[in-house]
């Protein structure tokens, strides 16, 4: 069942705005080519802890605040949002990681429900995203869960053709931007099998994309994700892939209600820092697509999906020792 492996994918952090960004000091050691937004909720939390004299907690949250994370582009004014982020990244000599999560009928009405009102609204929004990228460099993760919700039947059949058309069209439009690298979301190692994804990925435009993304907002280990990605790559012409390692340090959770294994599970840890130095020619990058410390949804005492949750952020950072 898809509910076992979905994750709350929205971000209410203001990701995608880039106001007040700095050109210097934004890249920690090991971040590779990716830009660190100094205005994330994690960064603000560090400031608050320092102000309140909570030095130990501040040091823990710096493990998140000092890393590049995905910028989840808000529905409102996408051109300005994306231009702000990619422009700030360019000034710092880096590139932004953009996450597009606005597909109509998103998340099957679950914790992260929403999305564009219809296909035309989505295309208009996507056009704004593309204009905002311009000729700057950006790594784009395209629509987490959107394809998998077609494969598992969560999305009603009447919306399938339109969604395939929107995904393929998004790949084609974004690839007109010379600096954009586009990865179609392909679920995770605990969801669907590679052979079940071959034709859906083809219909979604993976051949025109730079590759696909695995483990977005999930907890599968890097080893399991790499194995899954390699097998899936063999099904789609050897395409490379990126892995979301943001919270996979301790692997997936297998305690309590299986239907909530994906939602704010306890005892998880930060994973490998973002980098393009993966040691595997098929793995283009480890990314922190999900922003560690943001809730998966209102489960296990957490706030709504995408909201910053200091307690969970501290647990993730502390478990990474």
PLM region spans:
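N-terminal carbohydrate-binding/catalytic regions of secreted carbohydrate-active enzymes
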Residues: 29-132, 136, 291-316
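Surface-exposed substrate-engagement region within the catalytic domains
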Residues: 41-64, 189-310
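Surface-exposed cleft-lining segments at the edges of enzyme active sites
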Residues: 68-74, 112-117, 148-159, 183-186, ...
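Alpha-helical scaffolding segments of alpha/beta enzyme cores, especially the outer helices
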Residues: 84, 124-131, 162-173, 196-203, ...
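Sec-dependent N-terminal signal peptides
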Residues: 1-2
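C-terminal region of N-terminal signal peptides and the immediate post-cleavage residues
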Residues: 6-27
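Active-site cleft segment of glycoside hydrolase catalytic domains centered on the general acid/base Glu
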Residues: 115-135, 144-180
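Structural preference for beta-strand elements that scaffold enzyme active sites
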Residues: 93-97, 137-141, 179-183, 209-213, ...
